[in-house]
Amino acid sequence: MPRTDNDSWDLATSVGATATMVAAARAIATNADNPLIADRFAEPLVRAVGVDFFTRWVTGDLVVADVDDTESGWQLAQMPDAMAVRARFFDAFFQDATRAGVRQAVILASGLDARAYRLDWPAGMTVFEIDQPEVIAFKTTTLAGLGAVPRADLRTVAVDLRQDWPKALTEAGFDAGRPTAWIAEGLFGYLPPEAQDRLLDNITALSATGSRLACEAIPNRPQQDAEKARELMRKATARWREHGFELEFGDLGYEGDRADVELYLQNLGWQSVGTQMSQLLADNGAAPIPHNNDSVTMADTIYYSSVLTA
């Protein structure tokens, strides 16, 4: 079902289900023979959500070779390594920020992110998680049931990012006078282009000099390439739906030309370094994801680490 301005979701539907899919990929990566990450909360969270397709994927009952369309450029088989190196990128970002003295972090659209529970945070660290109320409530309750305890001062902020989240964040104790480490992981594609700009504007307005931001973006492509990408994605998910997958990824994102993230941030006073997914995979010894001259694939995603210097 296409997105609407005021749509909402839980972790089994719409945009929320993509967070569960990513957590499933992290769970598989964690259980690999030579794991690139260790996210012990990923599998129990996926099981608790209860989407059969993702549960079978995590347990190995889903045979990926039977599900994937190898010509589409979007394959389940690629996701565990891709999401593992993505997680490592954002983990390292937080570790670098805390080593630099940052003691305040904000995880935007936190989904099933368990970093507040699994990373080694320094004393005095405050972590804010922002997401839809149903998502926040489910994860908090489930992790408490598992006996998990946050390793930092965790403040959950149950608000839609399309609402006045800066106000809600401030009311939760956020201090705009202190440097902050922000992450927007797997978020921009689910925002309209103008909302992406507004989010970056709001982050900047709330950030003291020395704040840091990590995010990801898919490069703009000509309209015909975007249409080709949607066609290939629908081809991939059509195969998945034969095995119980119920999402149509092509309906979850927003179309339209987006600002170049690095240039947009530069104009706001941020200095950025971008690393392509293909490079992250190579740096971590993971199998490459082929580029597709006719379309965008996961290999084209760029991961930015930025510092506010103005």
Swiss-Prot record:
Annotated binding of S-adenosyl-L-methionine, by residue: 131, 160-161
EC class (word): transferase
**InterPro entries under this entry?**
Ppm1/Ppm2/Tcmp (IPR007213), SAM-dependent_MTases_sf (IPR029063), SAM_mthyl_Trfase_ML2640-like (IPR011610)
This enzyme's EC code(s) = 2.1.1.-
One GO molecular-function entry: methyltransferase activity
Cysteines joined through disulfide linkages: none
* Pfam families according to UniProt: LCM
Task: List keywords of the entry alphabetically.
Answer: Methyltransferase, S-adenosyl-L-methionine, Transferase
What family does the database annotate?
Answer: Belongs to the UPF0677 family.
| Name the UniProt record assigns to this protein | Putative S-adenosyl-L-methionine-dependent methyltransferase MUL_2766
Q: State the species of origin.
A: Mycobacterium ulcerans (strain Agy99)
